[in-house]
Design a protein with these regions (language model features):
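Nucleic-acid endonuclease domains
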Residues: 1-159
Length: 159
């Protein structure tokens, strides 16, 4: 795992009161969720562009879709009828479909931005550590608060 600390290179506004918390690029038009924002930041900071081999991801909302990172590659579970009935079924299906080699998770500290780059094994450990099955809405969610997530990631930087 690798960490890059950088100043946020793009002008944006965070509006947590919007559904699922949205970011705007301050043009009044471009709204995005956290994962899409992570992708833009990663591209601006690293010169990174999403490919089948590298992906920025958002774990704050619905893991079945990993919407921000995987929707364009059609690797995630995106249809309601495709939803698994058990956590084990979901995980087996997810890992069968997800084949990227580099995963980027971003934590925003206002003007500072930490990018955590993980390989497939580290990403899998991250997902399995924070995943929570919500039987009421038949969804996997990542039970994440940035402080807890960052502490977990920081602990693994030295490994």
């Amino acid at each position: 795992m690798k960490k890059i600390n950088a100043t946020t290179p793009l002008p944006y506004t965070f509006e947590p009161e919007r559904m699922n918390a949205k970011y705007s690029m301050n043009d009044g038009k471009t709204w995005m969720n956290h994962g899409e924002f992570c992708e833009r930041m990663a591209k601006a900071i690293l010169g990174y562009a999403p490919t089948k081999d590298a992906v920025a991801f958002d774990m704050g909302y619905d893991l079945p879709e990993l919407k921000a990172s995987i929707k364009s590659r059609k690797c995630g579970l995106t249809e309601r009828h495709d939803m698994p009935k058990t956590p084990a079924e979901f995980m087996a299906n997810f890992w069968e479909r997800e084949h990227a080699e580099l995963y980027i998770y971003a934590i925003d500290h206002g003007d500072e931005f930490n990018l955590y780059m993980m390989n497939r094994t580290e990403f899998r450990q991250f997902v399995e550590h924070f995943a929570k099955w919500d039987a009421h809405c038949v969804k996997f969610r990542i039970n994440v608060c940035d402080t807890k997530t960052e502490r977990w990631l920081e602990d693994r930087l030295g490994e």
